[in-house]
């Protein structure tokens, strides 16, 4: 299981991430081997949330959860809801698996897959109560901006997977990316900006500050939250 999880690489196309062979600890590797069967899901298999979680509950997807601490904290604070996380980097997945076991959580499952492919192939239309995209790679060099996750096509795809009234919430500490996301998301006809002035929102209580946010604040960066509802 560990070798498959660490070496699997989806078919090539323009992606919002680059797979790097990051350092993985012994405990993370052990978690991938022993906890993946409990928490991991196969993106090639049919996904039935009621069957996976044994109940019907609001379902949140976090895309690119990093080390998973924010996702685990949210799942613990909202035990009546269910959560799925999509990440491609094994060290972060291993870290989350350890955290899920430590907290005794059973309302989280994990995919190792490109989020676009997950939305296209696994998640039915209208299935999600929330989609969270916290601190995606800003790809700040001009030649790399085509790799940014939040694009018009992605916004339409994500909106289609939200139930009516469902929330799309993105956050970034790169102002240039924040402005691009604002333009893209405000241009999606099925998403309604929840900020009073139609721009940026205050950080909702359910989003605990991440290590990326704290790092950005130490560097003097601002943080921009964008919160939308599916019409």
Swiss-Prot record:
Binding-site residues for S-adenosyl-L-methionine, renumbered to this chain: 62, 87, 114, 137
Keyword hit for Membrane: no
Keywords: Methyltransferase, S-adenosyl-L-methionine, Transferase, tRNA processing
The EC number(s) this enzyme carries: 2.1.1.33
Positions that bind substrate: 141, 173, 210-213
Catalytic class of the enzyme: transferase
PROSITE patterns for the chain: SAM_MT_TRMB (PS51625)
CDD domains attached to this UniProt entry: AdoMet_MTases
Function in brief: Catalyzes the formation of N(7)-methylguanine at position 46 (m7G46) in tRNA.
Family assignment from sequence similarity: Belongs to the class I-like SAM-binding methyltransferase superfamily. TrmB family.
HAMAP family reported in the protein's UniProt record: tRNA_methyltr_TrmB (MF_01057)
Name recorded for this polypeptide: tRNA (guanine-N(7)-)-methyltransferase
Origin species: Methylococcus capsulatus (strain ATCC 33009 / NCIMB 11132 / Bath)
């Amino acid at each position: 299981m560990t070798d498959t999880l660490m070496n699997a690489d989806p078919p090539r196309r323009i992606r919002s991430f680059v797979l790097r062979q990051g350092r993985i600890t012994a405990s993370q590797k052990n978690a991938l081997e022993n906890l993946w069967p409990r928490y991991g899901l196969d993106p090639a298999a049919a996904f039935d949330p009621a069957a996976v979680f044994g109940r019907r509950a609001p379902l949140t997807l976090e895309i690119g959860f990093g080390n998973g601490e924010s996702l685990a904290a949210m799942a613990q604070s909202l035990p009546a809801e269910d959560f799925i996380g999509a990440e491609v980097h094994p060290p972060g997945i291993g870290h989350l698996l350890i955290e899920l076991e430590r907290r005794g959580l059973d309302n989280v499952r994990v995919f190792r897959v490109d989020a676009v492919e997950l939305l296209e192939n696994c998640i039915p239309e209208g299935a999600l109560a929330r989609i969270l995209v916290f601190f995606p790679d800003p790809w700040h060099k001009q030649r790399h901006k085509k790799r940014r996750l939040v694009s018009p096509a992605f916004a339409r795809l994500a909106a289609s997977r939200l139930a009516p009234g469902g929330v799309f919430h993105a956050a970034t500490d790169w102002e240039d990316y924040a402005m691009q996301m604002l333009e893209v998301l405000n241009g999606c006809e099925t998403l309604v900006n929840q900020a009073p002035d139609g721009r940026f929102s205050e950080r909702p209580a359910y989003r605990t500050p991440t290590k990326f946010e704290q790092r950005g604040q130490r560097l003097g960066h601002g943080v921009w939250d964008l919160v939308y509802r599916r019409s």
